[in-house]
Each structure stands twice: as C-alpha cells, then as structure tokens.
Amino acid sequence: MAIFEGSFTTASTLKVGIVIARFNDLITNKILSGCLDCLKRHGLDTSELSNQVDIVWVPGSFELPIAAKTLMKKKSYDVVIALGAVIRGETSHYDVVISEASKGISQVSNENNVPIIFGVLTTDTMQQALERAGIKNNLGWNYALQAIEMGSLIKNLN
C-alpha cells in the first residue's frame, strides 16, 4: 500500500503564486502578511527580488479566478493562493461574489492540475473578518500551510 502526503520539509523548493483582492484591503493586507510570514519561516524567499513567490493584486474577489488562470499560463507554479475578504452587506452581492469566486477558483485549479488554496474570508461582519486576519488568529498563516502541503503533495504525485 502506498500512502502519499504533503511535506513541510521541502517547502523551500516550491514556486508559489499569490492572487489577492484589493477590496477590503484592511483585511487582505493582514492575511497576506500572515501568509508571507509562514512561507518565509518554512524556507521560501519572500523578498521583493524573489523568484519563488509572485503576488498579483486584483480589484476584488470576483476577479481572483481569471488572475490565477492568467498567472499560471505565464509561469509554472506548484501552488497558487487566492486571498480575499468578502463581508456580507444588505444585498445579495455577497452571495454572488462568493459563489462565482469559489466556482471559478476550483475550475481553474482542476483545469491546470495546480492546487489553488481558497483563502477568501467570508464573514457576516467586519469584526469577524478582523478576528480572522490577526486579532485572534491570522488565517493567512493557515492558507500558506495548506499551500505548502498541497504544493508538495501534487509535486510528489507528478
């Protein structure tokens, strides 16, 4: 019986793309910071001159799938992390954005055989988003861990 798992010890060999929404940037900047901190602590070069990590900013979470798709056509990545924050408002816009962003990201991931980590916070309030972006816990760190594990797993399976 063969058992395959992702490895955190080979993280420094990964090529990571990050697509991030500018909308709600008070939140997304904090998530990005946590994400980059985790990647750096696991051996990736996150400096501005890095060839290991690329960051693409988009207007909002709805645009994350097309940016991820275009990014993957340009370079070869082991994993992509999609970061955003969608906070429920008084209209149905929230539901549309979350539905289309999640479907689009999943579709792009499957079409390209590259894992895309869904790091889009979906909260009812700004307070909930702030708690998940650093007041209590920074989920950016968790998204980076998922990226390391999935990137190394798919790399090993290929």
Swiss-Prot record:
It holds the Pfam family DMRL_synthase. SUPFAM superfamilies: Lumazine synthase (SSF52121). Keywords: Riboflavin biosynthesis, Transferase. The active site is at H93. Its EC number is 2.5.1.78. It catalyses: (2S)-2-hydroxy-3-oxobutyl phosphate + 5-amino-6-(D-ribitylamino)uracil = 6,7-dimethyl-8-(1-D-ribityl)lumazine + phosphate + 2 H2O + H(+). Catalyzes the formation of 6,7-dimethyl-8-ribityllumazine by condensation of 5-amino-6-(D-ribitylamino)uracil with 3,4-dihydroxy-2-butanone 4-phosphate. This is the penultimate step in the biosynthesis of riboflavin. This is 6,7-dimethyl-8-ribityllumazine synthase.
